[in-house]
Structure formats: C-alpha cells, structure tokens
Amino acid sequence: MYKRQVYGNDKCEPKLLVVIMASTREHYLNLEFTELELSIIETARKLSDISGIDYKLIRYCKDESELFCVQYINYKTKRYKNIQMNHLAKVFAKYGIGTTLSETSETKKYLNDKISSAFHKWQREVLGNNITASDIDLIKFENDEMSAIYELKRSVVPIDKWKPYSDDYANFKLISKFADMANLEFKIVYNQRRKNPYCDDISKLKLFSFDYRENRSNYCDTVILEDFLKGRYHG
C-alpha cells in the first residue's frame, strides 16, 4: 500500500503532505525503495514544492501483527530513524494536526488485520476527529508537468443519478484547497461499479468541480474514457 495523503485541520486547511508506505519486512529492514515508491515520493516532493506544503515520508511494516513504531525517512539522505507512535503524533501536532501528547504518553500497540491497517487505526485513535485527511487518488501530467488532481469515486448507483455526497465535502474541500495552492485543476470523477459481472465500468465517467469557497459541487460533464484521458471535457 502506498498513499499520498493530505492532512488538514478542522477547518479543512491543508497543513501537511505525507507519503505513507506499507512495506514488506524485507524492504522495511533493508530500507530499499521500490521503483514505484521512488516515483510516488518524487511526485510528493514536486507537489510540496509547488504548493508550499511540507511533506514527510513514513513507512511501516505490513507483515508485523503489531505496530510499535514507524520509519521516519529523510528522502534526500536516505537516512531514517525509528520513532514510536506517540512521537509521531507530536510531528503531526507541530503542524496543527491532532492533539499534542506529553513526553510521558504511553506507547500503545496497534494491530494489523485484514480490515484496517494498524497505521490507520492509530490515525483515527490518536489524531482524532478534529482533522481532515484525504488521499490524492490520481494526478494528471501534461508535458511532464502536473496539471490536475482527480478525486475518484465509485459505487453501484447509476451514473446518470450519482452526485457527490455531502458527507464527503470536508475531504473535497481539503483536496480542492490543496490543488488551488498548487495551481492545479481539481475534479471529482465518478464511475459505476457493476454487480453482474462484478467490475468497475470506466467506459463512461461523470465529472464534477468543487467550489471550496461556497462548499458545493457542480456538474461538469459525462464523457467516455478516451475523451477524459485527452482532457476533452467541459468545466
């Protein structure tokens, strides 16, 4: 699992970009970066440069049943230090994300299971509900330069009836603000998931923009995949 995640405060203001990597035990112990990891990290570095938002690299071992600590990585030097989970909370707190813990705060175990990773259990429990956090799902490049960020949504709701849910507006607001800071286009892209046979139908896509100033989504267009990939859509 590799994620580029934007974290913000309770006002949906972007504060930190974090690359979260769940590695095998072999890569974790040897601090070896895969080609995919290097690509994701480099994209995060560029996003940090153009948005002005700091970025951090965090890696944990997905093969361990319990999570006590993570690798806190300096990408430039390829050096890292293992930090306990309560110390990681203080890193986030410096950016106004979550609650500042005391030096004597107990380090807990966080368990990996098939449903949810230990890292995300830690995030929910320690950083709390007064934050916003959202993955960067898809980035568009034109002439080797980033031009857009897309939030991907899917469900079994027919494409002509689906519209963004208000429960997701906080995340849309966070990512659209981040995209604005980076001078990138932001769109919500929906595809329908079929039940029989079970598959994601991406032959047709429905696009929405999101105005974080007015906290509302606006329908843009419904296009075939080829037109989407070539940027041929309204809005």
Language-model segment annotations:
Residues 75-86, 199-223:
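Short, electropositive alpha-helical surface patch
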Residues 3-42, 136-140, 144-159:
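Conserved catalytic cores of phosphodiester-cleaving nucleases, focusing on short active-site segments
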Residues 24-31, 109, 119-127, 155-163:
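Surface-exposed cleft-lining segments at the edges of enzyme active sites
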Residues 47-71, 176-205:
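Nucleic-acid nuclease catalytic cores
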Residues 3-11, 43-55, 60-133, 235:
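Acidic-basic catalytic patches of nuclease active cores, encompassing PD-(D/E)XK
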Residues 105, 221-235:
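Charged phosphate-binding loop/patch that engages nucleotide di/tri-phosphates or the phosphate backbone
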Residues 30-60, 161-181:
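Short, charged, amphipathic alpha-helix that recurs within catalytic cores of restriction-modification
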Residues 108-124, 128-130, 169-193:
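Acidic, metal/cofactor-coordinating or nucleic-acid-engaging core segments within structured domains
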